[in-house]
């Protein structure tokens, strides 16, 4: 198995978050449109949080540290 490049992994998640924001809205209306937008928002949040994480490998375990405090309260 190839070595895990944690920094590259985080970059890919940041790129995925950006791609979700640029994703065009398909030609749907009503409930389908609402569901698509809701899913896109959830996808963005998930990818962005992982992309912003501090990652370490500890004894073979990938640890992602995600600071959920407001930006003005981070250390």
Language-model segments: what does each one mean?
Residues 1-75:
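Compositionally biased, non-globular sequence tracts
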